[in-house]
Amino acid sequence: MPFIPHTEEDVAEMLTSIGARSIDELFDEIPAELKTGKLTQVPPGLSEMEISRLMYERAQQDGFYLSFIGAGAYEHHIPAAVWQITTRGEFYSSYTPYQAEASQGTLQLLYEYQTMMASLAGMDVSNASLYDGASALAEAALMAVRQHRTSRRILVPQTVHPVYRSVMRTIVRNQAIEVVEVPYDPATGQVAIDKLDQFAQEEFAALIIPQPNFFGVLEQVDALTDWAHDKQSLAVAVVNPTSLAMLKPPGEWGRRGADIAVGEGQPLGIPLSSGGPYFGFMTCKQELVRQMPGRIIGRTTDLEGKEGFALTLQAREQHIRRSKATSNICTNQGLMVTAATIYMSLLGPEGLYRVAAHSHANTVALVEQLEKLPGVKKAFHSPFFHEAALQLSVPADKVLNRLKAQGVLGGVLLENHYPDLKNTLLVCATETKTAEDLDKYTEVLRQALAASA
């Protein structure tokens, strides 16, 4: 369709129709000091050759660091075939598959993704993705409130990722939903189940259950799930998809299983690239499918009896009345889902298990080595997956700076989110780390501790 700009006559007719004298009058409520015709902070334009050289020079400034940072974004090996296939034009440049007869490849891929995620989580249904793990948790909270009907309160343990909690509060704040936090046990790093008793006589739409939690610790998911169901609340799982290849899936937690399972899909073939783009996943039980946000791909047969795939449930504001929509999720993260589907297909169940097992083994080995250093001890005495919190006897921020100077990113400073966890690092070692990497971390930490004493 060609673009035809408005003529002066068009503009004059529209202004007369709305009773305005000029286009500027439409924006007169904007303070004059905020109006500008120039972008003063933007440099002048560059040619392709100039910008290529500039980016090359900037890239040379980047150093290589051995990273032991996790906290929600994880460094995993991604087979070269994943993005070689993902960036094919059929996937890379395609838009939302509204026209089913012309988009069978994309629709089948999304259907396979849903099947894999539902299987991985032990749930009945998966949608075609959400924006990221944090917004997926917020959507789960909204979904739980819609399903519960009588309560607009959500119980959220402090062991849930602090950024997830912040995003959830932001999204639900203007919908009259109250978020109530549950403290953690300082000895175990788990949800303090005994502290849940104070809420025994109160009504909540859902209890959020992280597995593993932000500290890397494994929660008592069976007891927490049963507690929620005994109180007529929904159990909402927040999980690391890599861990599901090794741990009990949410659908098998407790007597009845979790009702909803969400999480961040980045570990499934998405690279660490300045924080995104990632994608969120959501799975649930069949009885909740009508409350699920986003879109679902279904398998059907056409008039000739041939198998095909189509967009089935699309309870979003672009398709139905805004007041009836479950979410404003838009084109979402289809390309990221493409990469995740290819990643899971290439690795298969055995490959995913090996990634999880190797990551766990590496973190166990690293923690055992580091605990032998004077001034290092585990912050919590509980089982963990592939992250662990370590408490130092010296200022942890200075230690991290010394490690970085030696080419090692030593972890996340937990006191930034948990003021009571002074000088405590959250460290992670995935399958990408070798024995030599673990030894290097141990040695540079030993030197940093000695220099900081």
Curated annotation (Swiss-Prot):
Keyword Cell membrane found: no
GO molecular function: glycine dehydrogenase (decarboxylating) activity
Gene Ontology terms: biological process: glycine decarboxylation via glycine cleavage system; nucleoside metabolic process
UniProt-listed Pfam families: GDC-P
Root EC class: oxidoreductase
PANTHER family listed in its UniProt record: GLYCINE CLEAVAGE SYSTEM P-PROTEIN, GLYCINE DEHYDROGENASE (DECARBOXYLATING)
Function: The glycine cleavage system catalyzes the degradation of glycine. The P protein binds the alpha-amino group of glycine through its pyridoxal phosphate cofactor; CO(2) is released and the remaining methylamine moiety is then transferred to the lipoamide cofactor of the H protein.
Protein name, per record: Probable glycine dehydrogenase (decarboxylating) subunit 1
Record organism: Nitrosomonas europaea (strain ATCC 19718 / CIP 103999 / KCTC 2705 / NBRC 14298)
